[in-house]
Amino acid sequence: DLITKGVKVLIITPQDGAAAAAAAEAAHEAGVKVISYDRLILETEAVDYYVTFDSVAVGEAQAQYLVDKAEGEGNPLYLYAGAASDNNAFLFFEGAWNVLQPKIADGTFVIKNSSEAEAVADKAELTRDEMAGVVGQITTNWDFNTAKGLAEANLTATTAEDKGDVYILAPNDGTARAIADAFAADGDVSSYVVTGQDAEKASVQYIIDGKQSMTVLKDVRTLVGDAITAAITFLEGNTPPETHTYNNGEFDVPAKPSAVVSVDQANVQEAVIDSGYWPAEDFTGLE
């Protein structure tokens, strides 16, 4: 038990944001500072700081890529989300909705796989309950097989007119590859643009090969550095810098989100290889 060993700062990445609250509260009772790392600990005031990437900005970057690639009107749009138990999944979707909703409202995109999203398509801002309805219907649970199964079910339920050149909001790289595989296997899909997140090696290769359109690079070297800096700041008796707050259901948790980068075929060499994030020899087909 780290608390009985006398730690002064605890950095926690919660698998389940609400379930982690008990651990955070035990730490706080012992006078330990708690930093929530990447995912937010929910429903407790026992969180001193949140180190994360700007999850809303991630969703906005994904959606903006789809908007930039779309031409004309009536473009089929398929929406997918992360896990309903993960606060980040809501933030990603919030960011994506910020960008996509005006383009749904003006007819650029037509939602093809979510009656819940269609029902709120005229609303620029969604309540948490409205968003939960949408996320619950399009959740992949961050799982490759769940994502592929859902995509296949969506494609089976739609007609050839709902396909053609399609645009797909996929929440991360694992689900993006699964969904891309499903859409690539459908004879009525003539082309697809699909988003991703995390710059996983397999997805970087997919981008090089033209199987995945983009990913959002969240350089973990930056996040780790920011977490360590925050911990040291607490140990020195000071308070880390705050530019944002994130409400965890109990209060607004202070944070300073780290920057993210959109990556596609045009800048994959510079953003992923030249930056030292992944070595060139791990990939084939680089120019």
How would you label these PLM feature ranges?
Residues D1-E287:
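A residue-level marker of the well-folded mature domains of exported/periplasmic proteins
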